[in-house]
Amino acid sequence: MNIFEELKARGLVFQTTDEEALVKALTEGQVSYYTGYDPTADSLHLGHLVAILTSRRLQLAGHKPYALVGGATGLIGDPSFKDAERSLQTKETVLEWSGKIKGQLSQFLDFENGANKAELVNNYDWFSQISFIDFLRDVGKYFTVNYMMSKDSVKKRIETGISYTEFAYQIMQGYDFYELNQKFNVTLQIGGSDQWGNMTAGTELLRRKADKTGHVMTVPLITDANGKKFGKSEGNAVWLDADKTSPYEMYQFWLNVMDEDAIRFLKIFTFLSLEEIAEIEKAFDAARHERLAQKTLAKEVVTLVHGEEAFKQALNITEQLFAGNIKNLSAAELKQGLSNVPNYQVQDEDNLNIVEILVSSSISPSKRQAREDVQNGAIYLNGERIQDLDYTLTEDDKIDGQLTVIRRGKKKYAVLTY
């Protein structure tokens, strides 16, 4: 099975400009290819991971990746299938975010070794050197307004309004392909299926300005079995930066993937062979309740993104919280595992009697209810049941001197911080 056949078997090929010519190029020699990443936030997220891992698969097959950071296009904003104009960022912010993208990409692509080591390029390097007049003369003349208006990404914004700034974005992305082709002989661009219009602007410019053929391959935008956009947890993006989404939170995200999606996601997001995945699927179908596919998915992706130690920690937090063994975890681990739990900052003047603190932290709605909860054995302090109405919290109740975990019943938690 050649690399293109494997990408197809994994569900990673959505659309290509000329499949036969692309397969020929990929099987006959080394292809230089690129994927663009606009610095629209200070971290990449799971939505980027499909293209990143596809790029890694191609590098492992011997092809040469170029990671293009959109230092210039990030200042403009891509209108593709966005309902409204993006907020413009400052040059300083875009520069800072561009630097963070390189660090994250180096976790997946090899920038150090071999003839096909990855290269990082920034389109600000060439756009900052070209004047507006030169851009119109040397690039703009190759694009008709009719051609630009025909793009679905533009059509969807015509009714609500699109600025010239965003309208011109596709020409800028097209020029990226031209520059990379002229400087590094890049002949293939990879991106999400929502980028098709911008990407083919590049092949059009290559054809008209340089009389060369470029290839485009889009990867699918991933949705779950319910058709919801993939990569968000509780409405928030799942980030690759551990400071924005902890390894534990990412582990939980994958662990909670629906059965209908689990095997498909193993093909897309892991480097397990298709044969290994087929074996997992057999065992998974025989005992869905054991969630083997989700557990494997969570292990593989968290290890890939954050490393083996982070995976082991996420697994340990999961197991200890499930068993109620709060004291087996450090304060740092509890902050990961209980990041979405209500937090109450204990004040110096607070009464630390168990009934008082239950009301202060909103675990119990009233003192009467708090007393009933304690007497009925529904209150746990760091995993241990408290039934003494006169119990007062002490230094011994502070884990690592930083926090105390209160639980009411089976599911209602609060974290007291000091």
UniProtKB/Swiss-Prot annotation:
<dbReference type="GO" id="GO:0005524">
    <property type="term" value="F:ATP binding"/>
</dbReference>
<protein>
    <recommendedName>
        <fullName>Tyrosine--tRNA ligase</fullName>
        <ecNumber>6.1.1.1</ecNumber>
    </recommendedName>
</protein>
<feature type="binding site">
    <location>
        <position position="34"/>
    </location>
    <ligand>
        <name>L-tyrosine</name>
    </ligand>
</feature>
<keyword id="KW-0648">Protein biosynthesis</keyword>
<feature type="binding site">
    <location>
        <position position="169"/>
    </location>
    <ligand>
        <name>L-tyrosine</name>
    </ligand>
</feature>
<dbReference type="GO" id="GO:0004831">
    <property type="term" value="F:tyrosine-tRNA ligase activity"/>
</dbReference>
<keyword id="KW-0030">Aminoacyl-tRNA synthetase</keyword>
<keyword id="KW-0963">Cytoplasm</keyword>
<dbReference type="Pfam" id="PF00579">
    <property type="entry name" value="tRNA-synt_1b"/>
</dbReference>
<dbReference type="InterPro" id="IPR036986">
    <property type="entry name" value="S4_RNA-bd_sf"/>
</dbReference>
<feature type="binding site">
    <location>
        <position position="173"/>
    </location>
    <ligand>
        <name>L-tyrosine</name>
    </ligand>
</feature>
<dbReference type="InterPro" id="IPR001412">
    <property type="entry name" value="aa-tRNA-synth_I_CS"/>
</dbReference>
<dbReference type="Pfam" id="PF22421">
    <property type="entry name" value="SYY_C-terminal"/>
</dbReference>
<keyword id="KW-0067">ATP-binding</keyword>
<dbReference type="GO" id="GO:0005829">
    <property type="term" value="C:cytosol"/>
</dbReference>
<dbReference type="GO" id="GO:0003723">
    <property type="term" value="F:RNA binding"/>
</dbReference>
<comment type="function">
    <text>Catalyzes the attachment of tyrosine to tRNA(Tyr) in a two-step reaction: tyrosine is first activated by ATP to form Tyr-AMP and then transferred to the acceptor end of tRNA(Tyr).</text>
</comment>
<dbReference type="InterPro" id="IPR002307">
    <property type="entry name" value="Tyr-tRNA-ligase"/>
</dbReference>
<feature type="short sequence motif" description="'HIGH' region">
    <location>
        <begin position="39"/>
        <end position="48"/>
    </location>
</feature>
<feature type="short sequence motif" description="'KMSKS' region">
    <location>
        <begin position="229"/>
        <end position="233"/>
    </location>
</feature>
<keyword id="KW-0436">Ligase</keyword>
<feature type="domain" description="S4 RNA-binding">
    <location>
        <begin position="352"/>
        <end position="418"/>
    </location>
</feature>
<dbReference type="InterPro" id="IPR024107">
    <property type="entry name" value="Tyr-tRNA-ligase_bac_1"/>
</dbReference>
<keyword id="KW-0547">Nucleotide-binding</keyword>
<dbReference type="InterPro" id="IPR002942">
    <property type="entry name" value="S4_RNA-bd"/>
</dbReference>
<dbReference type="InterPro" id="IPR014729">
    <property type="entry name" value="Rossmann-like_a/b/a_fold"/>
</dbReference>
<dbReference type="InterPro" id="IPR002305">
    <property type="entry name" value="aa-tRNA-synth_Ic"/>
</dbReference>
<dbReference type="InterPro" id="IPR054608">
    <property type="entry name" value="SYY-like_C"/>
</dbReference>
<comment type="similarity">
    <text>Belongs to the class-I aminoacyl-tRNA synthetase family. TyrS type 1 subfamily.</text>
</comment>
<feature type="binding site">
    <location>
        <position position="232"/>
    </location>
    <ligand>
        <name>ATP</name>
    </ligand>
</feature>
<dbReference type="GO" id="GO:0006437">
    <property type="term" value="P:tyrosyl-tRNA aminoacylation"/>
</dbReference>
<dbReference type="InterPro" id="IPR024088">
    <property type="entry name" value="Tyr-tRNA-ligase_bac-type"/>
</dbReference>
<keyword id="KW-0694">RNA-binding</keyword>
<comment type="subunit">
    <text>Homodimer.</text>
</comment>
